[in-house]
């Protein structure tokens, strides 16, 4: 059964389309085969598609609920692809609920969360990636995330995947043509076009994965955990990055017992910053619990910031992580140590293989801007906050990586065997992974 015919079996749904609470305007949306009849009964007017009309809204007892704007969108030229009616009333909580109840009394049922978008998907008004882009746009934590979610809603991500998929199909057709003409197959496959095309596809897929990773990061926000010895200045650093007093700062080691979280934005990237308990031999059960929570936070972080007192730079932090997250070493308290603030040059570091180090003062703010730039670079955003042209989800990254693995396998096998049949089958698998 096609998605279009499936949608015709749906009943008519209604819901409040605007946030709850008081406001200037509230919108009730109705979608389904009875949308027009409900709208005309509610307004006691004859409605024309795409012609806004100022109407009164009537209750079951024929009393007037409110006066507002009514719009009707005829299938398939609507958000859901079905007949849709919208009622724009004054934004009081009670009047909005009364208008919704009137719609339900006339035969609509209350929509499930996300059901309007679901119907739009089932009616081919948007694909799944666009539907997810819509959700990301609604939940966007920053301006940059909103821009990218809007791009995905307009089809930017879908177009990028579809274009890559078409190139894979074109190459497979070329290879299958060589198989159909066996006397020319060797010439077809050995002339270098196939090998060059495989390299180009691998490069394009690598770029797409990188963009999707950054898009996913912007959609969900980055998790950054600060760890270090007690009194290294983690709480002061958190307050400096958040530009407000989030964590309690004292000279007493072990003041922070629980994980303190604060959402900040650096160059349009939403970041949940976590200040954790200082790592040391615990003096009591409460401190031990704080240290264990710190370790749990480290294990799920996108970036770990190790904060050390620059007056004791040899001090090491005793934590472990099974993940390969980027690590940034922050040498704090340069206002006391005398070191120049900023990113350390390779010659300033004892070992070039160690993570990037940034000298800062969490008290004066010196070096904080340099630290923010290092954070952006470690998140893969590149210079000056370069980011993805679309939003994405972790599942998208996973699917793209599976396609990349299949393409790598196809390329390696072809390099060894030069067998067109195997390559065509491998390309079919890559195509399937991309969907």
Q: What are these regions, as identified by a protein language model?
A:
Residues 287-310:
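Inter-motif core of Ras-like GTPase G domains
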Residues 273, 307, 330:
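Generic enzyme active-site microenvironment
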Residues 23, 50-53, 300-303, 324-327, ...:
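Short glycine-/polar-rich loops that comprise or flank the Walker A/P-loop
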Residues 21, 32-34, 74-78, 92-94, ...:
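Conserved nucleotide-binding/hydrolysis micro-motifs of P-loop NTPases
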């Amino acid at each position: 059964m096609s998605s279009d015919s499936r949608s015709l079996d749906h009943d008519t749904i209604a819901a409040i389309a605007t946030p709850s609470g008081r406001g200037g305007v509230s919108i009730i949306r109705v979608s389904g085969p009875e949308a027009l009849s409900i709208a005309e009964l509610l307004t006691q007017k004859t409605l024309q598609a795409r012609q806004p009309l100022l109407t009164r809204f009537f209750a079951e007892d024929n009393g007037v609920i409110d006066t507002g704007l009514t719009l009707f969108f005829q299938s398939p030229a609507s958000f859901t692809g079905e007949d849709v009616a919208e009622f724009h009333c004054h934004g009081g909580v009670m009047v909005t609920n009364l208008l919704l109840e009137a719609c339900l009394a006339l035969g609509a049922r209350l929509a499930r969360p996300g059901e309007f978008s679901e119907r739009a998907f089932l009616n081919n008004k948007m694909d799944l990636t666009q539907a997810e882009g819509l959700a990301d746009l609604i939940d966007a934590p920053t301006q940059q995330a909103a821009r990218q979610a809007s791009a995905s809603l307009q089809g930017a991500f879908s177009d990028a995947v579809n274009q890559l998929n078409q190139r894979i199909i074109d190459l497979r057709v070329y290879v299958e043509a060589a198989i159909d003409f066996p006397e020319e197959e060797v010439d077809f496959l050995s002339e270098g076009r196939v090998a060059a095309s495989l390299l180009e596809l691998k490069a394009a897929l690598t770029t797409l994965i990188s963009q999707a990773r950054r898009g996913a990061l912007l959609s969900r926000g980055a998790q950054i955990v600060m760890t270090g010895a007690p009194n290294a200045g983690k709480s002061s650093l958190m307050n400096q990055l958040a530009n407000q007093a989030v964590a309690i700062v004292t000279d007493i080691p072990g003041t922070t017992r629980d994980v303190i979280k604060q959402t900040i934005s650096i160059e349009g990237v939403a970041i949940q910053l976590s200040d954790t308990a200082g790592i040391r031999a615990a003096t009591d059960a409460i401190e031990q619990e704080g240290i264990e929570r710190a370790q749990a936070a480290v294990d799920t972080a996108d970036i770990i910031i190790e904060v050390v007192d620059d007056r004791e730079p040899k001090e090491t932090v005793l934590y472990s992580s099974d993940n390969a997250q980027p690590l940034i070493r922050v040498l704090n308290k340069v206002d006391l140590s005398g070191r120049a603030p900023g990113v350390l040059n390779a010659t300033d570091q004892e070992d070039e293989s160690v993570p990037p180090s940034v000298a800062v003062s969490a008290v004066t703010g010196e070096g904080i801007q340099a630290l923010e730039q290092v954070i952006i670079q470690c998140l893969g955003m590149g210079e000056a906050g370069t980011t993805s042209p679309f939003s994405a989800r972790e599942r998208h990254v996973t699917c793209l990586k599976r396609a990349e693995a299949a393409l790598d396998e196809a390329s390696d096998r072809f390099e060894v065997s030069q067998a067109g049949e195997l390559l065509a089958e491998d390309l079919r698998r890559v195509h399937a992974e991309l969907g």
